[in-house]
Amino acid sequence: MKKVRRFTAIIEKDGQWYVAHCPELDIASQGKSVKEARKNLKEAIALFFQHASPSEIANRMHSEVIVTQMVVPIG
């Protein structure tokens, strides 16, 4: 059975593309839809784990990522 791990995906629209970013590994990908961007990010993360050395994985891995929203007065 393959080992699995849960990662965060932050997806933003940029022009006609959707950019997906994984903050735990600082890896990003893109797609023409949210679904495609998410799929491409999953592929990029899987490829990273297939080819990166254990030390590179340890250096890039952020163990704690907090995603939150804030209310800021703007005017």
Residue ranges and their predicted role:
Residues M1-I10, K39-G75:
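Short, charged, surface-exposed hinge/linker loops at domain edges
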